[in-house]
């Protein structure tokens, strides 16, 4: 079946083998909510080699600073993949066990996959490049305050970090599915101090919002009116 997978007109990630007899299936019963007369099998993760180009440390709304690997895009299981989360510092050192200084570097030849044909994943380093290594940050990439280690994760120590504020607002907007509130608009509002918490969205002034500079242009009254209306 695995050899015929690519020729199918639809995506599959495995197969299920079961009795072709309803009475036999029922007589075998279940275990943990799963029928004993059936077995599911998953295909191995599709993997391809590529070249690591960059690591960007992103600040989440909780203050967690997560490394994201960017690499030459490859086609995997029907999707084009060009980036993958590295999760934390410990995972970087695990992957870079045979690399100079125990760190990843630009030009490293890596193996990437899509776990369960969904999640991009950096599996291993095949050949380390003879280049400078990507360092582990000592300060937050957003507010430049010192970082702290909490378990396996690096955290920003500044409670008013702009990236944390904008991250919390973006999460709120996404959760409520508020239309026309893009990331660039939220970033601009947080950068100019108009919004410090999600609650501040509901106290925005129409004039101030209309005069907000976004991408080299002011937002304008009609757009400002529309985005404010979409809050309710």
Residue ranges and their predicted role:
Residues 1-232:
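RNA/tRNA-interacting regions in translation and RNA-turnover enzymes
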């Amino acid at each position: 079946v695995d050899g015929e997978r690519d020729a199918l007109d639809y995506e599959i990630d495995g197969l299920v083998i079961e009795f072709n007899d309803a009475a036999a299936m029922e007589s075998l019963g279940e275990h943990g909510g799963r029928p004993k007369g059936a077995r599911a099998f998953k295909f191995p993760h599709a993997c391809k080699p590529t070249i690591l180009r960059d690591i960007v440390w992103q600040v989440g709304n909780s203050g967690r600073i997560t490394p994201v690997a960017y690499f030459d895009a490859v086609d995997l299981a029907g999707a084009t993949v060009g980036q993958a989360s590295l999760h934390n510092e410990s995972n970087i050192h695990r992957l870079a066990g045979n690399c100079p200084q125990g760190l990843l570097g630009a030009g490293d030849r890596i193996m990437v996959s899509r776990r369960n044909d969904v999640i991009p994943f950096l599996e291993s380093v095949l050949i380390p490049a003879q280049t400078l290594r990507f360092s582990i940050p000592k300060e937050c990439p957003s507010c430049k305050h010192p970082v702290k280690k909490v378990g396996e994760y690096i955290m920003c120590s500044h409670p008013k970090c702009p990236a944390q504020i904008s991250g919390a607002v973006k999460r709120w907007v996404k959760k409520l599915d508020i239309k026309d509130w893009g990331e660039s608009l939220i970033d601009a509002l947080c950068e100019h101090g108009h919004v410090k918490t999600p609650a501040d969205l509901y106290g925005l002034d129409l004039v101030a919002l209309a005069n907000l500079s976004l991408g080299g242009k002011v937002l304008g009254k009609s757009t400002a009116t529309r985005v404010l209306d979409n809050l309710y």
